[in-house]
Amino acid sequence: MDVESRKSLDRRLARVEGQVRGLRRMIEQGEYCCDILTQLSATRSALDQVGAELATSHVRTCIVGHGGETEHDKAKPMSGDELIEELRVTLSRLVR
């Protein structure tokens, strides 16, 4: 993963962290449950976006970039079938 991708993920996670703190504060202050659920939904969506960005980076650097210039330095040698299986596993982890 390149430096810009790491920075982008870190920024997104910092936002999620702030949203979680906001959720805790809302619960502590006894806010209206529907408002808390709305914030919870937004937090979950933000975390899903982190997962999508990370999966995209993995596909770009470890699957599509396998054996090329963009390959991640920790990518394992894989055959064509293993690359397809890696993509299947990546997608299944994202949609769980």
Task: Report residues per predicted region.
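Solvent-exposed interaction patches of small proteins and small membrane subunits
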Residues: 1-96
